[in-house]
Structures are given as structure tokens and as C-alpha cells.
Amino acid sequence: MFAPRFVVSMLGALAAFAIATYFLTGSIASTAVQTLLCAVLIQVGYFLAVLFLVWKEARDRRKLSPGQLPADPTNDEKQTGKLSLRRLNRPPHFNS
């Protein structure tokens, strides 16, 4: 879910919703209230979708590495002259 694309899409959907609501009701006040409510519902849906993606990623990572995590995960990064393999095994950024 790429945030700028989502914002542009959300504004387009809200504009279409506002136009349709105005033609159906003929009231600017009612259109504004309903469009604001629609915007809040879209934001709640976006938040829940991002929360689901984070949960799913955490679940998949737990399945891939069922072993015990070290007590101090930054221990190998503190040692001089060593490259942490943990940094190399990171997945690519999902927004690209």
C-alpha cells in the first residue's frame, strides 16, 4: 500500500462521493457531513489494512525462524570488524 497513491485515490473517491451525494440530496451541509463520514471510514479501513499487513508479515517471519532469538539482538553489531548478517537478510521495501 503506497501512501501517496492511496491519498490521491482517496481524494478522487471522496470527490466522486461528494458529487453523487450532492446530486442525490441537493444539500451542501448533508453532502459535507456524509463526505466527512466517508473519509473517516476510508481512513479506518486503511489503518486496519496496514495493521493486517504488519500482523501477516510478523506471522510469516515467526514461521520462517522458529528458533529462539538471542537475548541481545544487537550483540553481533557491536563487535568491530564483523558485518551483521541480520542486516543483509532484510526483505526489500514493499512500497517500491
Curated annotation (Swiss-Prot):
Pathway info: Glycan metabolism; exopolysaccharide biosynthesis
Key words, A-Z: Cell membrane, Exopolysaccharide synthesis, Membrane, Nodulation, Plasmid, Transmembrane, Transmembrane helix
Protein origin, superkingdom: Bacteria
Any one Gene Ontology cellular component term annotated for this protein: plasma membrane
GO terms classed as biological process: polysaccharide biosynthetic process
Main location as per UniProt: membrane
Region of interest: Disordered: 64-96
Functional summary from the UniProt entry: Inhibition of exopolysaccharide synthesis (EPS) and nodulation ability (NOD).
Annotated protein name in UniProt: Exopolysaccharide production repressor protein
Organism: Sinorhizobium fredii (strain NBRC 101917 / NGR234)
